[in-house]
Amino acid sequence: MSNPLRLAFRPFALLYEAIVQTRNQLFNRAVLRAWESPMPVVSVGNLSAGGTGKTPMVDWVVKYYLSIGFKPAIISRGYKRQSKGVQLVSDGNNVLLSSREAGDETAMLAWNNPDAIVVVASKRKQGVKLITKRFAQRLPSVIILDDAFQHRQIARSLDIVLVNAEEPFVEAAMLPEGRLREPKKNLLRADVVVLNKITDLEAATPSIKALEEMGRPLVKARLSTGELICFSGDATTLDEPATAHHLNAFAFAGIAKPESFVTSLQHEGVNVGATRFVRDHAPYSAKMLRAIRRQAEEQGLCLITTEKDYFRLLGQPELLSIITALPCYYLKIAPDIFDGKALLQEKLNAVVHYVPKPEPPKKIEEPYRRW
Protein backbone atom coordinates (compact mmCIF):
# COMPACT_ATOMS: atom_id res chain seq x y z
CA MET A 1 0.00 0.00 0.00
CA SER A 2 1.40 3.40 -0.99
CA ASN A 3 2.28 5.90 1.76
CA PRO A 4 -0.47 8.46 0.87
CA LEU A 5 -3.07 5.69 0.92
CA ARG A 6 -1.75 4.38 4.25
CA LEU A 7 -1.99 7.86 5.73
CA ALA A 8 -5.59 8.13 4.54
CA PHE A 9 -6.45 4.95 6.46
CA ARG A 10 -4.57 5.95 9.64
CA PRO A 11 -7.57 7.55 11.45
CA PHE A 12 -9.56 4.36 10.94
CA ALA A 13 -6.59 2.30 12.16
CA LEU A 14 -6.37 4.42 15.33
CA LEU A 15 -10.09 3.96 15.94
CA TYR A 16 -9.82 0.20 15.42
CA GLU A 17 -6.84 0.04 17.78
CA ALA A 18 -8.80 1.90 20.46
CA ILE A 19 -11.68 -0.58 20.18
CA VAL A 20 -9.33 -3.58 20.32
CA GLN A 21 -7.40 -2.24 23.29
CA THR A 22 -10.56 -1.36 25.22
CA ARG A 23 -11.70 -4.96 24.88
CA ASN A 24 -8.27 -6.26 25.90
CA GLN A 25 -8.25 -4.06 28.99
CA LEU A 26 -11.57 -5.58 30.06
CA PHE A 27 -9.89 -9.01 30.03
CA ASN A 28 -6.67 -7.71 31.61
CA ARG A 29 -8.66 -6.24 34.52
CA ALA A 30 -10.90 -9.33 34.84
CA VAL A 31 -14.04 -7.36 33.99
CA LEU A 32 -14.44 -9.98 31.27
CA ARG A 33 -13.31 -13.39 32.46
CA ALA A 34 -11.85 -16.24 30.45
CA TRP A 35 -13.65 -19.57 30.78
CA GLU A 36 -11.57 -22.47 32.10
CA SER A 37 -11.59 -25.60 29.95
CA PRO A 38 -11.55 -29.00 31.70
CA MET A 39 -8.64 -29.90 29.39
CA PRO A 40 -5.39 -27.97 28.92
CA VAL A 41 -5.47 -25.53 26.01
CA VAL A 42 -2.81 -24.43 23.53
CA SER A 43 -3.60 -21.47 21.28
CA VAL A 44 -1.85 -20.99 17.94
CA GLY A 45 -2.52 -17.55 16.50
CA ASN A 46 -1.06 -14.43 14.99
CA LEU A 47 -1.21 -10.64 15.10
CA SER A 48 -1.86 -10.08 11.41
CA ALA A 49 -4.67 -10.92 9.02
CA GLY A 50 -3.47 -14.20 7.54
CA GLY A 51 -0.38 -15.26 5.65
CA THR A 52 1.82 -16.24 8.61
CA GLY A 53 1.83 -20.00 8.01
CA LYS A 54 -0.42 -20.62 11.00
CA THR A 55 -2.17 -23.74 9.66
CA PRO A 56 1.10 -25.63 9.02
CA MET A 57 2.17 -24.71 12.57
CA VAL A 58 -1.09 -26.06 14.01
CA ASP A 59 -0.43 -29.24 12.03
CA TRP A 60 3.11 -29.41 13.46
CA VAL A 61 1.87 -29.01 17.05
CA VAL A 62 -0.79 -31.71 16.56
CA LYS A 63 1.73 -34.12 15.06
CA TYR A 64 4.17 -33.43 17.89
CA TYR A 65 1.60 -34.33 20.55
CA LEU A 66 0.63 -37.48 18.66
CA SER A 67 4.32 -38.45 18.40
CA ILE A 68 4.78 -38.37 22.19
CA GLY A 69 1.61 -40.37 22.87
CA PHE A 70 -1.02 -37.70 23.56
CA LYS A 71 -4.36 -37.35 21.78
CA PRO A 72 -5.08 -33.74 20.78
CA ALA A 73 -8.31 -32.12 19.65
CA ILE A 74 -8.39 -29.17 17.26
CA ILE A 75 -11.01 -26.43 17.49
CA SER A 76 -11.18 -24.03 14.57
CA ARG A 77 -13.59 -21.34 13.48
CA GLY A 78 -13.79 -23.02 10.07
CA TYR A 79 -13.38 -19.85 8.05
CA LYS A 80 -15.74 -19.55 5.03
CA ARG A 81 -17.44 -22.86 5.82
CA GLN A 82 -21.02 -23.39 4.68
CA SER A 83 -22.17 -25.14 7.86
CA LYS A 84 -23.51 -23.33 10.91
CA GLY A 85 -22.99 -23.68 14.64
CA VAL A 86 -20.79 -26.34 16.22
CA GLN A 87 -19.86 -29.28 14.01
CA LEU A 88 -17.75 -32.40 14.54
CA VAL A 89 -15.37 -32.63 11.58
CA SER A 90 -13.48 -35.74 12.71
CA ASP A 91 -14.01 -38.08 15.65
CA GLY A 92 -10.39 -39.23 15.59
CA ASN A 93 -11.27 -42.20 13.40
CA ASN A 94 -13.25 -40.82 10.47
CA VAL A 95 -13.51 -37.46 8.71
CA LEU A 96 -17.21 -36.62 8.78
CA LEU A 97 -17.48 -33.32 6.88
CA SER A 98 -16.34 -32.04 3.49
CA SER A 99 -14.18 -28.96 3.03
CA ARG A 100 -17.30 -26.98 2.13
CA GLU A 101 -18.84 -27.85 5.50
CA ALA A 102 -15.65 -27.63 7.57
CA GLY A 103 -13.63 -24.93 5.79
CA ASP A 104 -10.49 -25.46 3.71
CA GLU A 105 -7.83 -25.42 6.41
CA THR A 106 -9.90 -27.37 8.93
CA ALA A 107 -10.62 -30.14 6.43
CA MET A 108 -6.92 -30.28 5.58
CA LEU A 109 -5.99 -30.60 9.27
CA ALA A 110 -8.55 -33.38 9.73
CA TRP A 111 -7.38 -35.41 6.73
CA ASN A 112 -3.70 -34.96 7.64
CA ASN A 113 -4.25 -35.97 11.28
CA PRO A 114 -6.75 -38.86 11.27
CA ASP A 115 -6.09 -39.66 14.95
CA ALA A 116 -7.04 -36.16 16.13
CA ILE A 117 -10.53 -34.96 17.05
CA VAL A 118 -11.47 -31.89 14.98
CA VAL A 119 -14.34 -29.48 15.65
CA VAL A 120 -15.47 -26.25 14.00
CA ALA A 121 -17.18 -23.64 16.17
CA SER A 122 -17.57 -19.88 15.86
CA LYS A 123 -17.62 -19.79 19.66
CA ARG A 124 -14.69 -21.95 20.73
CA LYS A 125 -16.25 -22.51 24.17
CA GLN A 126 -19.13 -24.36 22.52
CA GLY A 127 -16.57 -26.50 20.70
CA VAL A 128 -14.94 -27.49 24.00
CA LYS A 129 -18.35 -28.34 25.46
CA LEU A 130 -19.17 -30.55 22.46
CA ILE A 131 -15.91 -32.44 22.92
CA THR A 132 -16.48 -32.79 26.67
CA LYS A 133 -19.96 -34.23 26.09
CA ARG A 134 -19.25 -36.38 23.02
CA PHE A 135 -15.96 -37.84 24.28
CA ALA A 136 -16.67 -37.94 28.02
CA GLN A 137 -15.29 -41.49 28.29
CA ARG A 138 -12.02 -40.61 26.50
CA LEU A 139 -11.32 -36.92 26.73
CA PRO A 140 -8.47 -35.65 24.56
CA SER A 141 -5.21 -34.84 26.30
CA VAL A 142 -5.06 -31.26 25.04
CA ILE A 143 -7.14 -28.78 23.04
CA ILE A 144 -5.44 -26.91 20.18
CA LEU A 145 -7.22 -23.63 19.39
CA ASP A 146 -6.61 -22.56 15.80
CA ASP A 147 -6.32 -18.78 15.29
CA ALA A 148 -7.32 -17.85 18.83
CA PHE A 149 -4.86 -15.20 20.04
CA GLN A 150 -7.64 -12.60 19.80
CA HIS A 151 -10.26 -15.06 21.12
CA ARG A 152 -9.67 -14.52 24.82
CA GLN A 153 -12.94 -16.01 26.08
CA ILE A 154 -11.13 -19.30 26.79
CA ALA A 155 -8.17 -19.46 29.18
CA ARG A 156 -5.12 -21.19 27.80
CA SER A 157 -2.01 -22.83 29.17
CA LEU A 158 0.14 -21.74 26.24
CA ASP A 159 -0.16 -18.93 23.69
CA ILE A 160 1.94 -19.45 20.55
CA VAL A 161 1.92 -16.41 18.25
CA LEU A 162 3.31 -16.36 14.73
CA VAL A 163 4.88 -13.35 13.02
CA ASN A 164 5.51 -13.30 9.28
CA ALA A 165 9.17 -12.58 8.47
CA GLU A 166 8.16 -11.54 4.95
CA GLU A 167 6.45 -8.45 6.40
CA PRO A 168 8.89 -6.18 8.32
CA PHE A 169 7.70 -6.23 11.93
CA VAL A 170 9.08 -2.75 12.60
CA GLU A 171 6.82 -1.22 9.92
CA ALA A 172 3.66 -3.20 10.76
CA ALA A 173 0.50 -1.13 11.26
CA MET A 174 -3.07 -1.74 12.38
CA LEU A 175 -5.92 -2.53 10.00
CA PRO A 176 -6.91 -0.98 7.64
CA GLU A 177 -3.64 0.99 7.35
CA GLY A 178 -1.68 -2.25 7.63
CA ARG A 179 -2.47 -5.90 8.38
CA LEU A 180 -2.31 -6.04 12.19
CA ARG A 181 -5.36 -7.15 14.15
CA GLU A 182 -3.69 -6.06 17.40
CA PRO A 183 -0.91 -3.61 18.27
CA LYS A 184 2.61 -5.04 18.24
CA LYS A 185 2.99 -4.48 22.00
CA ASN A 186 0.29 -7.09 22.61
CA LEU A 187 2.86 -9.76 21.79
CA LEU A 188 3.75 -9.42 25.47
CA ARG A 189 0.74 -11.72 26.09
CA ALA A 190 2.40 -14.47 24.08
CA ASP A 191 4.23 -17.31 25.80
CA VAL A 192 6.21 -18.09 22.64
CA VAL A 193 6.69 -15.99 19.50
CA VAL A 194 7.50 -17.82 16.25
CA LEU A 195 9.09 -15.71 13.53
CA ASN A 196 8.01 -17.79 10.55
CA LYS A 197 8.67 -17.79 6.81
CA ILE A 198 12.31 -16.75 7.20
CA THR A 199 14.03 -17.05 3.83
CA ASP A 200 16.95 -14.69 4.45
CA LEU A 201 18.36 -14.33 7.97
CA GLU A 202 20.05 -11.04 7.13
CA ALA A 203 16.81 -9.54 5.81
CA ALA A 204 14.97 -10.79 8.91
CA THR A 205 17.52 -9.25 11.32
CA PRO A 206 15.52 -6.04 12.04
CA SER A 207 12.42 -8.10 12.89
CA ILE A 208 14.48 -10.49 15.03
CA LYS A 209 16.01 -7.61 17.00
CA ALA A 210 12.63 -5.93 17.51
CA LEU A 211 11.10 -9.18 18.75
CA GLU A 212 14.05 -9.99 21.02
CA GLU A 213 13.74 -6.55 22.61
CA MET A 214 10.19 -7.47 23.66
CA GLY A 215 11.63 -10.17 25.90
CA ARG A 216 9.39 -13.05 24.86
CA PRO A 217 10.85 -16.49 24.02
CA LEU A 218 11.60 -16.42 20.28
CA VAL A 219 11.57 -19.35 17.87
CA LYS A 220 12.78 -19.03 14.28
CA ALA A 221 11.26 -21.07 11.46
CA ARG A 222 10.88 -21.25 7.73
CA LEU A 223 8.36 -23.05 5.56
CA SER A 224 9.90 -26.13 4.03
CA THR A 225 8.48 -27.53 0.82
CA GLY A 226 7.87 -31.23 0.80
CA GLU A 227 6.45 -33.67 -1.71
CA LEU A 228 4.49 -32.97 -4.86
CA ILE A 229 1.46 -35.24 -4.60
CA CYS A 230 -0.37 -36.31 -7.76
CA PHE A 231 -4.17 -36.24 -7.57
CA SER A 232 -5.16 -36.63 -11.22
CA GLY A 233 -7.25 -39.58 -12.30
CA ASP A 234 -9.08 -41.04 -9.28
CA ALA A 235 -9.10 -38.03 -6.91
CA THR A 236 -9.49 -40.27 -3.88
CA THR A 237 -6.29 -42.19 -4.58
CA LEU A 238 -3.03 -40.30 -4.33
CA ASP A 239 -0.09 -41.54 -6.37
CA GLU A 240 3.53 -41.63 -5.33
CA PRO A 241 5.24 -38.25 -4.85
CA ALA A 242 6.36 -36.65 -8.10
CA THR A 243 9.78 -35.27 -8.93
CA ALA A 244 9.50 -31.51 -9.15
CA HIS A 245 12.60 -30.91 -11.25
CA HIS A 246 11.91 -29.96 -14.86
CA LEU A 247 8.11 -30.01 -14.51
CA ASN A 248 6.46 -27.39 -16.70
CA ALA A 249 3.50 -26.18 -14.73
CA PHE A 250 0.48 -23.91 -14.58
CA ALA A 251 0.25 -22.79 -10.93
CA PHE A 252 -3.11 -21.76 -9.51
CA ALA A 253 -4.18 -20.98 -5.94
CA GLY A 254 -6.44 -18.99 -3.67
CA ILE A 255 -4.18 -18.05 -0.76
CA ALA A 256 -3.10 -14.88 1.02
CA LYS A 257 0.45 -14.81 -0.41
CA PRO A 258 0.47 -16.53 -3.85
CA GLU A 259 3.87 -15.12 -4.75
CA SER A 260 5.47 -17.22 -2.00
CA PHE A 261 3.84 -20.32 -3.53
CA VAL A 262 5.43 -19.55 -6.91
CA THR A 263 8.80 -18.95 -5.24
CA SER A 264 8.55 -22.32 -3.47
CA LEU A 265 7.80 -24.10 -6.75
CA GLN A 266 10.70 -22.41 -8.52
CA HIS A 267 13.00 -23.28 -5.61
CA GLU A 268 12.04 -26.93 -6.11
CA GLY A 269 12.96 -26.74 -9.80
CA VAL A 270 9.48 -26.34 -11.28
CA ASN A 271 9.26 -24.20 -14.40
CA VAL A 272 6.16 -22.07 -13.78
CA GLY A 273 4.88 -21.23 -17.26
CA ALA A 274 1.57 -19.62 -16.28
CA THR A 275 -0.36 -18.64 -13.16
CA ARG A 276 -3.91 -17.88 -12.07
CA PHE A 277 -4.65 -16.65 -8.55
CA VAL A 278 -7.82 -15.71 -6.71
CA ARG A 279 -8.17 -14.08 -3.32
CA ASP A 280 -7.78 -16.19 -0.18
CA HIS A 281 -10.73 -18.58 0.29
CA ALA A 282 -12.47 -17.31 -2.87
CA PRO A 283 -14.61 -20.03 -4.48
CA TYR A 284 -13.58 -21.62 -7.76
CA SER A 285 -16.13 -21.68 -10.56
CA ALA A 286 -16.51 -24.29 -13.29
CA LYS A 287 -15.88 -21.56 -15.87
CA MET A 288 -12.59 -20.57 -14.23
CA LEU A 289 -11.33 -24.14 -13.95
CA ARG A 290 -12.22 -24.87 -17.59
CA ALA A 291 -10.23 -21.79 -18.60
CA ILE A 292 -7.27 -22.96 -16.49
CA ARG A 293 -7.43 -26.44 -18.03
CA ARG A 294 -7.72 -25.05 -21.56
CA GLN A 295 -4.71 -22.75 -21.17
CA ALA A 296 -2.63 -25.52 -19.58
CA GLU A 297 -3.51 -27.88 -22.44
CA GLU A 298 -2.60 -25.27 -25.06
CA GLN A 299 0.78 -24.62 -23.42
CA GLY A 300 1.52 -28.26 -22.62
CA LEU A 301 1.60 -27.66 -18.86
CA CYS A 302 0.62 -29.78 -15.88
CA LEU A 303 -1.41 -28.20 -13.07
CA ILE A 304 0.00 -27.48 -9.61
CA THR A 305 -1.85 -25.98 -6.66
CA THR A 306 -1.47 -25.70 -2.89
CA GLU A 307 -2.44 -28.38 -0.43
CA LYS A 308 -5.19 -26.14 0.93
CA ASP A 309 -6.64 -25.59 -2.55
CA TYR A 310 -6.58 -29.32 -3.22
CA PHE A 311 -8.65 -30.01 -0.12
CA ARG A 312 -11.02 -27.19 -1.07
CA LEU A 313 -11.62 -28.83 -4.46
CA LEU A 314 -11.83 -32.29 -2.90
CA GLY A 315 -15.06 -31.17 -1.25
CA GLN A 316 -16.47 -30.30 -4.68
CA PRO A 317 -15.87 -33.35 -6.88
CA GLU A 318 -17.87 -31.85 -9.75
CA LEU A 319 -15.25 -29.08 -9.96
CA LEU A 320 -12.27 -31.31 -9.31
CA SER A 321 -13.23 -33.56 -12.24
CA ILE A 322 -12.87 -30.61 -14.64
CA ILE A 323 -9.10 -30.50 -14.25
CA THR A 324 -8.07 -34.08 -13.43
CA ALA A 325 -7.86 -35.14 -17.08
CA LEU A 326 -4.50 -33.35 -16.95
CA PRO A 327 -1.62 -34.29 -14.63
CA CYS A 328 -2.46 -32.48 -11.37
CA TYR A 329 -0.31 -32.02 -8.26
CA TYR A 330 -0.38 -30.24 -4.95
CA LEU A 331 2.64 -29.10 -2.97
CA LYS A 332 2.98 -30.06 0.68
CA ILE A 333 4.65 -27.62 3.06
CA ALA A 334 5.66 -27.86 6.72
CA PRO A 335 7.41 -25.64 9.27
CA ASP A 336 11.15 -26.14 9.55
CA ILE A 337 12.02 -24.89 13.04
CA PHE A 338 15.76 -24.24 12.83
CA ASP A 339 16.23 -22.25 16.05
CA GLY A 340 14.33 -22.81 19.30
CA LYS A 341 12.73 -26.18 18.53
CA ALA A 342 13.72 -27.66 21.90
CA LEU A 343 12.30 -24.59 23.65
CA LEU A 344 8.96 -24.95 21.87
CA GLN A 345 8.81 -28.68 22.62
CA GLU A 346 9.59 -27.96 26.28
CA LYS A 347 6.67 -25.51 26.45
CA LEU A 348 4.32 -28.01 24.79
CA ASN A 349 5.49 -30.79 27.13
CA ALA A 350 4.76 -28.65 30.19
CA VAL A 351 1.13 -28.20 29.12
CA VAL A 352 0.48 -31.96 29.36
CA HIS A 353 3.04 -32.58 32.16
CA TYR A 354 5.14 -34.74 29.88
CA VAL A 355 8.70 -35.48 30.92
CA PRO A 356 10.80 -36.99 28.12
CA LYS A 357 12.81 -40.01 29.09
CA PRO A 358 16.51 -39.19 29.21
CA GLU A 359 18.53 -40.82 26.48
CA PRO A 360 20.67 -43.68 27.79
CA PRO A 361 24.36 -42.82 27.97
CA LYS A 362 26.34 -44.04 25.03
CA LYS A 363 28.43 -47.07 25.81
CA ILE A 364 32.10 -46.29 25.49
CA GLU A 365 33.87 -49.35 24.23
CA GLU A 366 37.37 -49.93 25.49
CA PRO A 367 40.02 -50.34 22.84
CA TYR A 368 40.92 -53.92 21.99
CA ARG A 369 43.89 -55.13 24.00
CA ARG A 370 46.31 -57.89 23.26
CA TRP A 371 47.29 -60.05 26.23
Curated annotation (Swiss-Prot):
Recorded catalytic activity of this chain's protein: a lipid A disaccharide + ATP = a lipid IVA + ADP + H(+)
Pathway participation: Glycolipid biosynthesis; lipid IV(A) biosynthesis; lipid IV(A) from (3R)-3-hydroxytetradecanoyl-[acyl-carrier-protein] and UDP-N-acetyl-alpha-D-glucosamine: step 6/6
Enzyme Commission (EC) number: 2.7.1.130
Superkingdom as given in the UniProt entry: Bacteria
Keywords recorded for this protein, A-Z: ATP-binding, Kinase, Lipid A biosynthesis, Lipid biosynthesis, Lipid metabolism, Nucleotide-binding, Transferase
GO molecular function: ATP binding; tetraacyldisaccharide 4'-kinase activity
Pfam families: LpxK (PF02606)
UniProt-listed GO biological process terms: lipid A biosynthetic process; lipopolysaccharide core region biosynthetic process
Chain positions recorded as ATP binding sites: S48, A49, G50, G51, T52, G53, K54, T55
A cellular component annotation (GO) from this entry: plasma membrane
Family, as annotated: Belongs to the LpxK family.
Function: Transfers the gamma-phosphate of ATP to the 4'-position of a tetraacyldisaccharide 1-phosphate intermediate (termed DS-1-P) to form tetraacyldisaccharide 1,4'-bis-phosphate (lipid IVA).
Protein known as: Tetraacyldisaccharide 4'-kinase
Species of provenance: Chlorobium chlorochromatii (strain CaD3)
Gene from which this protein is expressed: lpxK
